[in-house]
From Swiss-Prot:
GO terms for molecular function: protein disulfide isomerase activity; thioredoxin-disulfide reductase (NADPH) activity. This is Thioredoxin domain-containing protein 2. Its main location: cytoplasm. Pfam families: Thioredoxin (PF00085). Residues 148-205, 217-259, 277-304, 313-348 have a biased composition (Basic and acidic residues). It comes from Rattus norvegicus. It is found in: Cytoplasm. Probably plays a regulatory role in sperm development. May participate in regulation of fibrous sheath (FS) assembly by supporting the formation of disulfide bonds during sperm tail morphogenesis. May also be required to rectify incorrect disulfide pairing and generate suitable pairs between the FS constituents. Can reduce disulfide bonds in vitro in the presence of NADP and thioredoxin reductase. GO terms for cellular component: cytoplasm; outer dense fiber; sperm flagellum.
Length: 550
């Protein structure tokens, strides 16, 4: 081939400076045979014209034969069409050069090589062209096995065409196909071939339009009916990639279209059943739970105020009755919703396996409501018990307060404006309340509360020579509350001393007569005469005065 290329370059008048060792002899032969080259060129033009007609006729026959015999449309169109365009157009650049070179070859070589290459190319190119005329969607139409088989069948052929075109640049059918696309076909072969070229052009336009999403309009021809079907399926598959729903797809789209419908139907049916069961069960639960909750809460609200009102009363017998009434009602209220929720749970567990998670979420809510109800129902018991404990202590404190606040009617009353406390700081109640139980015993036996002035004078007469200690105090006075426990404790130590307590608010006249101006004030009497007096919350001074004056 290298020698032939040198000969062709010399025939054209091109100068080659570097040639192999055998090149001079061959160049001489070519120069001697210069006259023969012209004759061979003319004969070659005739032979090439005839070979073009034969090749094009064989191409048309094979294309018609291939299009009618194929029962199923070939699959891979887009890739082969693009591949055919890619392989043909590079040839278009080199084809004029190869054609001019081939005209100057020897007649024997041309007849042998062109006939062999044209036969091989006519057997190969119609297949590739027939394949290029059909649309392709390898991923969406037929199974992958057919697609890979077609690819494997096409690649060697196209690669052979490329290799042969690079080696010899002899392929006339490629030149003819290029010329047919450009409209350079000879007039003798233009008539029988024009119809087929129009069909192939239409099919190529259909494949390009199918890629753009346009429907092919070549369904009028009987031969193109299969192409229309494949183009429509290709359009549907391309539209499905863009987001449209495919109308006809064979493998993946049919599965994708069937499975979403099946899944949607199953999910909707299951969702409908689940939603109905869930709604019914939730409604039944809510109706069952709300009723006992309302009943129990109303009963609790009605019963708890009664128990609270009764607890304010000192008798404990009235507290136990509402407790007995409320506890059975609570037990009944708790048992009813628990049975209802258990039945509701049994109804829910009948649902399918797919709704297990929904059941778990649903069944948790009744348990939470039961726990909430139990917490609600338990809390009144605790509150009632706390009320019982609370109501016991107020009885004692109320009794003690009643006994403490009772003042004698005979005591001397004094004006409140004249009474002043000796200390502004008031003691805390925590320091006073621990002595309340002790105060009750002291008030009963040791400390006597004076109610009026007459009673006070009688006590002084009866005492005679005994020491009488009198505490002038008021309930609102903080230092008075602080000194009261100490005053009662000293009454237990000194049995030979009479301890009296005067409420300045009840005995104003007595306060005025005794000239009490500060609270608390302690006065000491013997033989109806005053022997000692001091004011203020002074515990040590009180003890010392009693010990000295006794």
């Amino acid at each position: 081939m290298f020698k032939k290329n040198q000969k062709l370059s010399k025939d054209k008048g091109l100068e080659v400076n570097s040639v192999q060792a055998g090149a001079p002899e061959e160049s001489d032969v070519k120069l001697n045979n210069g006259g023969k080259a012209n004759e061979r060129g003319s004969n070659e033009f005739l032979d090439t014209a005839q070979s073009k007609e034969k090749v094009i006729a064989s191409v048309v026959g094979n294309m018609l034969h291939m299009s009618t015999e194929e029962s199923e449309p070939p699959q891979q169109v887009s890739s082969t069409s693009m591949f055919s365009e890619n392989t043909i157009y590079p040839k278009h650049e080199g084809s004029p050069k190869s054609s001019t070179k081939n005209t100057q070859l020897k007649q024997e070589d041309i007849s042998k090589t062109s006939s062999y290459s044209k036969q091989t190319n006519s057997s190969n190119i119609p297949k590739s062209l027939a394949i290029t005329t059909y649309p392709k969607q390898g991923s969406t139409l037929k199974p992958a096995a057919n697609g890979t088989h077609d690819r494997e069948a096409e690649k060697p052929k196209s690669s052979e065409d490329l290799i042969q075109s690079k080696k010899g640049d002899i392929f006339k059918p490629s030149e003819d196909s290029i010329q047919s696309k450009k409209g350079d076909m000879p007039k003798s072969s233009e008539d029988p071939i024009q119809s087929k070229k129009d069909d192939t052009a239409k099919s190529l336009e259909d494949t390009i339009q199918s890629k753009n999403g346009d429907m092919p309009k070549s369904s009028e021809d009987p031969i193109q009916s299969k192409k229309d079907d494949t183009a429509r399926s290709l359009e549907d598959s391309i539209q499905s990639k863009k987001g449209d729903m495919p109308k006809s797809s064979d493998t993946i789209q049919s599965k994708e279209s069937e499975t979403p419908k099946f899944l949607q139907d199953t999910i909707q049916s299951k969702g409908g059943k689940i939603n109905k069961q869930v709604k019914d069960s939730m409604k039944s639960k809510e109706s069952k739970i709300r009723k006992p909750l309302k009943d129990s809460i109303q009963s609790k609200e009605n019963k708890i105020p009664k128990s609270s009102q009764d607890s304010a009363q000192p008798k404990e017998g009235k507290i136990h009755k509402p407790l007995k009434d409320s506890l059975p009602s609570k037990e009944g209220d708790i048992s009813k919703p628990s049975e209802d929720t258990i039945q509701a749970k049994e109804e829910i567990t009948v649902s399918p396996e797919d709704t297990i998670q929904a059941k778990e979420e649903i069944t948790m809510s009744p348990e939470d409501t039961i726990q909430a109800k139990e917490e609600i129902t338990v809390s009144p018991e605790d509150t009632i018990q706390a009320k019982e404990e609370i109501t016991v202590s107020p009885e004692d404190t109320m009794q003690s307060k009643e006994e403490i606040t009772v003042s004698p009617e005979d005591t001397v009353q004094s004006q409140e404006g004249d009474i002043k406390s000796s200390e502004d700081v008031q003691p805390s109640e925590n320091e006073i309340f621990p002595f309340e139980a002790e105060i009750e015993t002291l008030e009963e036996g040791m400390v006597r509360v004076i109610k009026d002035k007459e009673e006070f004078e009688e006590v002084l007469k009866d005492a005679g020579e005994k020491l009488v200690a009198v505490d002038f105090s008021a309930p609102w006075c903080g230092p008075c509350r602080k000194m009261r426990p100490h005053f009662h404790s000293l009454s237990l130590k000194h049995e030979d001393v009479i301890f009296l307590e005067v409420d300045t608010e009840d005995c104003e006249q007595l306060v005025q007569d005794c000239e009490v101006f500060h609270l608390p004030t302690f006065q000491f009497y013997k033989n109806e005469e005053k022997v000692g007096e001091f004011s203020g919350a002074l515990v040590e001074k009180l003890e010392k005065s009693i010990a000295e004056l006794k």
